[in-house]
Amino acid sequence: MPVRFVSLIGLLLLACGAGESPYPSPAQTYGTYKDAVLGDRPHEVWACFSARYRQLEYEDSLERWLAAWPVERATRQEAVRRLQIQQEKLINDRIGFLRFDDSTVEADASPFFYFVQEEDGWKVTTHLDPAFRQALEQAVAEGEFRLPFAR
């Protein structure tokens, strides 16, 4: 009887973990994004994007994103196959970034993925996201982060 009880508790704990967010950190969000891109699952890719990114890039239109996916798919798949994370940096509890190894980044591409913390976890955004920029400026002003080129 005690063995059954322990087994039941173990199963319950596993079931509880199954409902965890796929976006607990920038690196794990990127992993979720990468799996969705390689698995040709555009709805899951969309879920990795921040609300502001969706608005800025696709006018917050899932239909627009789904129409763009066939055009963007190959480029995104090639990129996620190539990119290797060099650094994960949480600037504070609101923003962070991933820096990719320069040898894995195309010459005309940014070596960074930017992230914002939303209600359901860390989401991909763009450096053009006004909320990201404002949070970054505030982090710099408060000494939470120093821009690499700043003295």
Predicted regions, residues:
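N-terminal acidic leader/helix
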Residues: 100-101
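Short, conserved catalytic or interaction motifs in soluble domains
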Residues: 18
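Well-ordered beta-strand positions in beta-sheet-rich domains
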Residues: 82, 110-112
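Short, surface-exposed charged micro-motifs
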Residues: 87, 112-114
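Low-complexity, intrinsically disordered terminal/linker segments enriched in charged
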Residues: 91-95, 104-110, 118-119, 123-151
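Short solvent-exposed beta->alpha transition segments
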Residues: 21-22, 27-32, 37, 42-95, ...
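C-terminal motif of bacterial Sec signal peptides marking the signal peptidase cleavage site
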Residues: 13-15
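Sec-dependent signal peptide recognition
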Residues: 2-9
